Regions:
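FIC/Doc superfamily catalytic core
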Residues: 1-348
């Protein structure tokens, strides 16, 4: 049986990359706190966009999809699920909403994790919702020629409940005693959770929901305004590579979790940087044309209307479209493609 001792982690010597990421995140979190005090109403516009993106991206990573219009309607609770994928999407929405509203009242225990998993599947008939796995699961890769390779074998079902209890106890102990930096403890906990793989289904999505919960409980609220799940989805190969590196030797307790820590901290810092970019556009009272011009300058290479919408949440679609037309006419942007495939890029 794998053992867990989070106190031992504090003896590890961290390289300058890890220490630099932690320092930068604290600096950005401090800036965010000031922005939230100064302009809370304007920043609320970012919350709904982040909810939609998080729900869409985290499910898409697992191949659970529907149209963008349906995602928006489901997240805004303006429609009911039509199929299994939409049932799973609605469940994710529900858990994310609970975390947003009540994170400080959700202790990190096996019981609460099981309850959140049950809510994740509350829109469908899943007899294993809210229960740890009943059969051995495997982390696999399927190759173009069709053959499947087992990359990692998680804990056996009979070991899972005790292991889940232990990582919760260890995490709560080192955080409660202030033994370990939260930005180290959080990725270590999430990595152990993914190695245990406690459920028959929903492990990846639960890991991302728990990441948000743990960050909120430690005062890092960036995920409320910028979707961490969308950032992971954009770089999911890096996510899986970091996870695979960190899993080597896990059963023997000799794993090197640093690649996963660096990946997760890098993702969190990138989200804070995005938050700052969007705040600059929200807080300055600009005309739509200038706001879209500045937003386009924040993009490298090709971008679409959705990219601008995310940076300019206060603008209507018609205002964005009008500004894009003017920038094209002025020779600042070039348009490519038609319909859903329309994209733009800067000419200077």
């Amino acid at each position: 049986m794998r053992t867990f001792n989070y106190s031992a982690i504090k003896e590890q010597k961290w390289d300058s990359d890890v220490l630099g990421l932690i320092a930068a995140i604290y600096k950005e979190a401090g800036k965010q706190e000031l922005y939230l005090k100064q302009r809370p109403e304007e920043l609320e516009k970012l919350v709904e966009i982040a909810k939609i993106q998080s729900t869409e991206a985290s499910n898409a990573i697992e191949g659970i999809v529907t149209t963008s219009t349906r995602i928006r309607q489901l997240v805004e609770e303006k429609t009911t699920p039509r199929n299994r994928d939409e049932q799973e999407i609605a469940g994710y929405r529900d858990v994310l909403s609970i975390i947003h509203e009540s994170f400080d009242a959700i202790p990190i225990t096996q019981n609460y994790i099981l309850q959140l998993h049950k809510i994740l599947y509350s829109h469908m008939n899943n007899p294993l919702a809210g229960r740890t796995k009943s059969v051995q699961n495997y982390i696999t890769a399927t190759y173009p020629d069709g053959h499947v390779e087992t990359l990692f074998t998680p804990l056996a079902p009979y070991e899972t409940p005790e292991a889940l209890d232990r990582i919760c106890e260890e995490y709560n102990r080192v955080i409660g005693n202030m033994e370990l930096e939260p930005l180290i403890a959080i990725p270590v906990f999430i990595h152990d959770f993914l190695c245990i793989h406690p459920f028959n289904d929903g492990n990846g999505r639960m890991s991302r929901l728990l990441t948000t919960l743990l960050l909120y409980r430690n005062g890092f609220y960036v995920g409320k305004y910028i979707s961490l799940e969308a950032k992971i989805a954009k770089n999911k190969d890096l996510y899986y590579d970091a996870l695979a590196q960190a899993q080597t030797g896990w059963h023997e307790g000799i794993e090197d979790v640093v690649p996963f820590i660096k990946y997760l901290l890098g993702t969190i810092l990138a989200a804070y940087k995005d938050f700052e970019d969007r705040v600059v556009l929200v807080e300055t009272k600009l005309h739509a044309l200038e706001m879209v011009r500045r937003a386009s300058k924040n993009r490298i290479g090709r971008f679409n209307k959705q990219d601008i919408r995310e940076l300019c949440p206060s603008l209507s679609d018609s205002s964005i479209e009008g500004a894009l037309r003017k920038l094209i006419a002025a020779g600042e942007l070039k348009k490519e493609g038609k319909g859903k495939n329309t994209c733009y890029f800067r000419l200077n």
